């Protein structure tokens, strides 16, 4: 018998003060997308936290809907893990020309709100008003099930070889729960 593990991943949700305020959302799956779709109509100031692929796509989508968009990232440029500076500079210029506010090199410290709803994101360098906040700051492998049973990286990703074999014979793993075998970024 063989076992193939496809445990997936889940968005990273830091334990920031105010994280439980209404209208702070995740973006990973269909259910998250439905909630974002429901909330987009009433939102005026949208803050996207995380300027990777998902965050950048969301910023563009909300700009097309004529929302005031702020894109916050701790890195000093958007898509820093995927594009070199020459290309990210072009994308950043296009974003700012379209009215998207880029807040780069700042780390989120907390969320503030009123009547249980988010109103503001506070970073280590500033404060930004927003009535809808979407967290796009990365994912963690869903590997609690195999903790202590298979070899993993520090982040919990299952270590695999070129044939998706794990540290246990006849146990294979694929997808977001595994380490990345090739990542030029």
Predicted regions and their residues:
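Short hydrophobic core segments
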Residues: 1-8, 49, 69, 129-138
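Feature captures the FAD/FMN-dependent oxidoreductase FAD-binding
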Residues: 1-7, 110-117
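Nucleotide donor/acceptor-binding cores
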Residues: 2, 22, 43-45, 67
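Hydrophobic/aromatic beta-strand patches that form the interior of the parallel beta-sheet core
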Residues: 4, 25, 47, 70-72, ...
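Glycine/Thr-rich phosphate-binding loops of Rossmann-like dinucleotide-binding domains
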Residues: 13-14, 56-57, 80, 143-144, ...
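FAD-site-proximal beta/loop scaffold in flavoenzymes
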Residues: 20-41, 115-120, 127-185
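Glycine-rich Rossmann-fold phosphate-binding loop(s) that bind the pyrophosphate
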Residues: 28-29, 49-52
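Rossmann-like dinucleotide-binding cores of NAD(P)H-dependent redox enzymes
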Residues: 34, 45, 53-110
